[in-house]
């Protein structure tokens, strides 16, 4: 099967849908992979790493010509025009965007929205939401610490003592638990209402 990994075109998107490690596994199973030139640059993965894993580096039209297309976010209208009828697109496709889903259906494209995969032990390898929420919880506390005008941990100096920052974390899901752990590691006093 020919698998395409295009460059993500959404503003601010720095992720890539496949890593050299996953590409190596797919190639060992007999698949042919085309990665769009520069697809991994924003994720700190150069084209040479994909080539070393066995992928072919190509243009957008070649990556979108795959029978299976791996995307991080849903394709835009320009990208949809490059996808062949009968192709399969896998990624975080926003299954509640009826307009986009309708356009894919009209073009004969099969779509698998990973964010709609059940969050069960059996489907755990498809769970993209937990990993993204984990990163979001971590980053939220780092951003809060950056914007906080004082310090996160308690500091005792010759000039006096600075109390630890008080952090309120709303929610105790995957993101909330990671936020609690990060705030604690930074030395803040934290609270999460139950």
Tell me the role of every PLM-derived stretch.
Residues 6-45, 151-194:
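Glycine-rich phosphate/diphosphate-binding loop of Rossmann-like nucleotide-binding domains
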Residues 28-32, 55-56, 71, 106-110, ...:
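Generic secondary-structure signature for well-ordered alpha-helical cores
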Residues 57-65, 104, 135-147, 172-187:
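Short, Lys/Arg-enriched charge-dense amphipathic segments
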Residues 2-103, 107:
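An N-terminal-biased, well-structured beta-alpha scaffold segment characteristic
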Residues 2, 8, 78-166:
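Glycine/serine-rich phosphate-binding loop and adjoining beta1-alpha1 elements at the start
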């Amino acid at each position: 099967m020919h698998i395409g990994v295009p460059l993500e075109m959404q503003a601010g998107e720095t992720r890539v849908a496949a890593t050299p490690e996953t590409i190596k596994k797919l190639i060992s199973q007999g698949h042919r992979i085309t990665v769009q030139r520069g697809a991994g640059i924003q994720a700190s993965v150069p084209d040479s790493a994909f080539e070393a894993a066995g992928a072919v580096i190509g243009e957008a039209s070649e990556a979108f010509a795959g029978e299976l297309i791996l995307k991080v976010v849903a394709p835009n209208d320009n990208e949809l025009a490059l996808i062949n009828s009968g192709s399969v697109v896998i990624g975080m496709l926003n299954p509640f965007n009826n307009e986009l889903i309708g356009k894919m259906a009209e073009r004969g494209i099969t779509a698998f929205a990973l964010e709609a995969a059940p969050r069960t032990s059996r489907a755990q390898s498809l769970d993209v939401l937990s990993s993204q929420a984990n990163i979001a919880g971590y980053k939220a506390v780092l951003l809060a610490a950056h914007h906080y005008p004082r310090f996160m941990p308690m500091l005792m100096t010759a000039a006096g003592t600075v109390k630890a920052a008080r952090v309120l974390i709303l929610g105790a899901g995957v993101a909330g638990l990671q936020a609690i752990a990060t705030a604690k590691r930074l030395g803040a006093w934290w609270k999460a209402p139950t």
